[in-house]
Amino acid sequence: MSLLPVMVIFGLSFPPVFFELLVPLALFFLLRRLLQPTGIYDFVWHPALFNTALYCCLFYLISCLFV
């Protein structure tokens, strides 16, 4: 249960989890952009699965901070 209120922007109601999804998405794009030049994706068996797991881990960490 989040303590953040429901946000209303231009008459559209957004639940708190919407913003909890946007913050890790921004961090994911930044982290992915930093990891690509390091060559870590050469050691990853399935890059799409790695990206999904990375986003899920970031979402979990951010949602723990918001609670």
UniProtKB/Swiss-Prot annotation:
The chain crosses the membrane at residues 9-29, 47-67. Pfam families: DUF1656. Coiled coil: none annotated. InterPro entries: DUF1656. The keyword Transmembrane helix applies. Keywords: Cell membrane, Membrane, Transmembrane, Transmembrane helix. It is found in: Cell membrane. The keyword Membrane applies. It comes from the Bacteria. It is a multi-pass membrane protein. Its main location: membrane. GO terms for cellular component: plasma membrane. Belongs to the AaeX family. This is Protein AaeX. It comes from Serratia marcescens. The lineage of its organism: Bacteria, Pseudomonadati, Pseudomonadota, Gammaproteobacteria, Enterobacterales.
